[in-house]
Amino acid sequence: MPVRRGVAVGVLALAVLIFSSPGAFAQGQTGSIAGVVRDTSGAVLPGVTVEASSPALIEKVRTVVTDGQGRYNIVDLRPGTYSVAFTLTGFSTVKREGIELTSGFTANVNTDLRVGTIEETVTVTGESPIVDTQSTSKLATASREVMDVLPTDRNFVSFAALTSSVLVTGVRQNVGGSIPETGMNLVVHGSRASDSLVTVEGMPIINGGGTGGLMYGNYLNNGLAQEITFQTDSHNAEFERATVYSNFIPKEGSNTFRGSVFGRWAGESWQSDNLSDEQKAQGLSTGNRIDRIWDINPNVGGPIVRDRLWVYGGFRHWGTYNTVANSFKDADFSDIFYHPTTEQNLNPVWHESVVARFTVQANQKNKFNLYTDWQYTYFGNCFVPTYLTAISACPEYKNIPQYILQGSWSSPVTNKLLLEAGGTITPQDFHGYRRPGVSETQFAMNDTTAPAGMPQNWGASTGYGYNRSDQTNYRASASYVTGSHSIKTGFMLMHAWRYNTQEPNNSASLSVRGTQPFSLTQYATPIQFHETLRYNMGIFAQDQWRYNRFTFNYGVRLDFLNARVDPQDIVAGPFTPARHFDAVENVPNWKDVDPRFGVVWDLFGDGKTALKGSVGRYVVGAAYEIARPANPVQSSVNTVTRTWAPPAGVIYNGDYNPYNDCDLFNPAANTKRPGQIQCGAIQNPAFGQVTARTTNYDPAVINGWHVRPNNWEGQVSIQREIVPRVSAYAAYTRRWFGNLTATRNQNVTNADYTHYCIPIPVDSRLPNGGGYQQCGLYDVNRVITPNNLIFSSADIGGIDDVYDGFDFDVNARLARNVILSGGVTLGRERVNNCILKDDLSLAFGTDPRTDDYCNITPPFQPQVKGQVAYPLPRWDVSLSATFQSLSGPQLSASYPMSNAIAGPSLGRPYTGVPPNINIVPNGTMYGDRIYQTDFRISKALRTGGTVIRPTFSVYNLFNANPVQTYNTTYGAAWLSPTVILQARFWDIGVQVDF
């Protein structure tokens, strides 16, 4: 639907911000308490002993002394509630209680001491600081309390989604856990979707293939979480990328046995129906619905050796079975063709985790942690199943039991020097198997002419194969902390490798039109790939310097990344001889210097108003997959198409096995059944051969200093404590990308193409109602073997890619644990690659080469988030709700071309396969906005030291039905809904804390 720019949406956004609103979200593994100590005359006091104590500290107390400016800084404090005592001979002792500390937050605690004796103690219970006047970073924290009270599925992405500036991509809107926990991307302020990073205690747990997003393989055991933090902006020199860092901080055991048991269940009969008559009329006969959702998560911890060795461990089994919209079970997998029943297909996904964390306090100065998580995962359908692919054509994906093994050490050598180190190993095996009922001899079938609402793919899958990746990473740092300076230096090092295969049945797949054979694809099996990330290393040094009311955060980071393609030996296959491929080194070999700078001004000196500014250079994430384009196996001709069709006017009467119809080992045209069927010559004679790479990198973009894709991020913000426990935040963020590349086919020039136009049908659904000529289209005059070169777009003038955005947040943590918070983000990413459109040797996709397709300026669209939790103390009942209002999906119109459509202007048939052309410029049409409100009520039942908390939750409270995905193929069914928001459903749960 065309974009509507109205004031109404903005007014609604502000209303939600004020009256409903994400919060309790305030990275790092630990926090800090810092401040200045003065006497009652205002003079600073050096030499004051400052002690921070909390049950969260295994050693119970952490001690520092104020410096010559009266400043102190206590670092490496685990999340929890702290008391801070200030003592100096000749002065009364002051004890400040009730300081709530979250990871990555610096609580500013200033104190005045009056003359007296140490024995005199003045206890102050004030409001906990909520404005960080020292760090420029924007942090959000999902504490244990927040995770337990809000109506969510306990997936860390669900908590990230409640942060106003964060956008979840890669999946549809998740209603109460109805979207299976699979690979998900978190985006903030125009960051790359694949850059988001998931860590446990600051160390990545992604598989070796992911750069952060699409984190297949490891799924977090929520019961072990003390809190989860999300860092979104103004990252210091410790961080490689400017993205969302999701950091999982596990619980630690203590001298007291404690734990919890959580359970949750939702069934198919607990869901309403939100499919409208209009959506049914548009062809959506059924929606996605839940079949069952469950989560079982007991955990417990305590001492093994009191005051020395502790453990905290747990088990979790959770999953989702959903029906797939418009997708119905096949009556017989073994039949050549798809025969739907009236029973909807299910998408079963489940995970299992057994995790334990061991903590050793070897002595007062040395603490060790060992974290291990053994997991098993099952995906019983396609990752994102739709009716277009029958379930038989989806592999069963299984993770062979795999694990995370992580160790860490910390040592506060003195009250000024802190040493830390750690390492993580994450082997992952993730394979695609044939599902029961699909035989090894069955072919993968495709029919692009299938009627609307019917699958285009059935039979077997072409996605079978083996995937193994190993990722290891290490970190070490040293921090030197005085009252005025906090200096930190260290490094992070990552290695990764992958081996994966492609194993389609019969080394062939078939295409039909109805029941008539059309073409087939042969595969050069076995197909396998080996790549290695030799190292991704960052070395950093930074300082946080407090001077008067200013805090300067400055640092520099050196990034080094090197990947290679390993030597590969592939045995002979049905169509190919044995092959050997030499190693390919330094693809890429990048080196970067990345400066970071930020400043915080405590505007009035009272710790309640902070004006902040920051700017930094960040590299774009990469892993071994960066080497894939340089892999000679990738550039080999691994698939080839040939016609497989009966002569004109002949009805096919074979068994749909092309091996019986033709000699597929003969590359020339041939048949075994003259007059009945004919196989054409293979379209590429180089099929299965070791060939020169058709895509190469300009050495200038893969080797050297400062050639890695990067982005600069700048931000200015202000945070103000309005009243105690209530703060407001506003920010402007700008991100601009650098070292963007372009691809040139060096074997073609403009003279090798013919320009043509196509008539756009008159259609009120199209921009301006259609009925015009779309020009700027080109078809190559002859088949030309590509010789692609990837080079810096700056060589031809550059591609512009810039994000601008505004954030407005309110956070309130009121008395009696009332949470009321929310935020609005307005942003857009502008891209101009018009430098590519006039040179036809430059890759541009199949979009028209006109200004409205290359200069993309979408509108600002508000993203609104809110949450509230309100305990009713008289009945020990808690009410909570969350709200999200998100922009609808961007729409496109992929218009299938034919010689009949393009021929009159082109003057000849297409040289190759007719393309699909997008006839709606990007950023001009969007679907319906998505509104989602979730609600929970819980009741605490207390008996002795045990609290039993049953819950009742309702998701999509108002049963909204916005369309989440549309049919994007232009035609009569264009814009018909394929998936709508999950209908309202409810679940029951219980949590027992002991």
What kind of region is each of these model predictions?
Residues 2-143:
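Periplasm-facing N-terminal accessory domains of Gram-negative outer-membrane beta-barrel systems
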Residues 258, 288-378, 400-423, 595:
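Transmembrane beta-barrel wall of Gram-negative outer-membrane proteins
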Residues 156, 166-169, 567-594, 598-794, ...:
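Solvent-exposed loop/turn elements at secondary-structure boundaries
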Residues 561, 729-892:
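Gram-negative outer-membrane beta-barrel transporters
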Residues 126, 261-267, 313-317, 370-374, ...:
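Transmembrane beta-barrel strands of outer-membrane/channel proteins
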Residues 621, 725, 739, 746, ...:
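C-terminal beta-signal and adjacent terminal beta-strands/loops
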Residues 67, 91-252, 271, 278-285, ...:
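Periplasmic N-terminal accessory/gating domains of Gram-negative outer-membrane beta-barrel systems
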